[in-house]
């Protein structure tokens, strides 16, 4: 209990020292800050999704992929990879908080936000430790079978709660895909940093992706991530672009870009 309170106090103190966050927290409240942070984190992850897909294209030429990974293995890129865990886990856990709020009537926002911040710190610290060790290994099939079962169970629980509501089908699929990704995306980031060779050695990456079960997992991730990301960007466009023609044009562009990246990702996964 004391550890949790000390952690909460440390996080709150750190955030209060950031002028921009502190100003809006005091004038608009923490829910406002959390909501905007969720959108910003989501947009960062969409940008990373595009970048990640682009880097994986070089798997068609293993020497080129290995050369790229040497650059991405530099100290600066390693720090950026670790920092990526912040928007990943924040967006993931806050999405879980929203699902609990909307569908399961858990309205104690103060407590939920404290858990959100505390668990985010724990995850980022754990990833940092694993990256520094760089010596861990696990059976890919066993790891992803466990995670897939957990993700599907969670997604089914959310689907059973939301499916009979009056919301649109697209809205429901956004929540269901979010529940699935709540497990799979943090798990993917952890898996890729258990050992440097897991994500940076072309031959090991290709060998893993040639397994039919891993292909199924990767394809599931691609479909869920692309849909969730596309819906999220469309929501931002709809909420903050008032000019109808411009909003429609952006929506079409978002759909086109997401379809292209989905096609590229699916084609790459199947062809390896």
What are the language-model segments listed below?
Residues 1-272:
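Membrane-embedded alpha-helical bundles that constitute the cytochrome b-like, heme-associated redox core
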């Amino acid at each position: 209990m004391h550890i949790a309170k000390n952690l909460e106090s440390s996080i709150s103190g750190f955030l209060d020292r950031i002028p921009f966050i502190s100003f809006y927290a005091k004038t608009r409240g923490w829910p406002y800050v959390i909501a905007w942070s969720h959108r910003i984190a989501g947009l960062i992850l969409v940008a990373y999704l595009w970048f990640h897909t682009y880097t994986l294209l070089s798997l068609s030429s293993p020497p080129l992929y290995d050369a790229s990974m040497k650059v991405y293995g530099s100290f600066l890129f390693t720090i950026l990879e670790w920092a990526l865990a912040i928007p990943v886990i924040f967006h993931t856990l806050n999405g879980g908080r929203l699902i609990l709020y909307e569908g399961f009537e858990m309205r104690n926002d103060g407590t939920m936000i404290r858990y959100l911040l505390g668990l985010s710190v724990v995850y980022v610290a754990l990833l940092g430790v694993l990256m520094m060790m760089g010596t861990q290994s696990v059976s890919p099939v066993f790891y992803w079978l466990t995670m897939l079962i957990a993700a599907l169970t969670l997604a089914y629980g959310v689907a059973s709660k939301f499916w009979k509501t009056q919301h649109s089908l697209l809205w429901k699929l956004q929540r269901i895909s979010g529940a699935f990704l709540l497990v799979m995306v943090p798990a993917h980031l952890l898996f890729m940093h258990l050992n440097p060779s897991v994500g940076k050695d072309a031959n090991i990456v290709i060998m893993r992706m040639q397994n039919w079960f891993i292909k199924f997992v990767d394809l599931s991730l691609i479909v869920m991530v692309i849909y969730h990301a596309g819906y999220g960007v469309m929501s931002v466009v709809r909420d903050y672009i008032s000019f109808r023609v411009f909003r429609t044009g952006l929506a079409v562009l978002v759909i086109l870009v997401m379809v292209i990246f989905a096609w590229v990702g699916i084609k790459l996964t199947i062809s390896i």
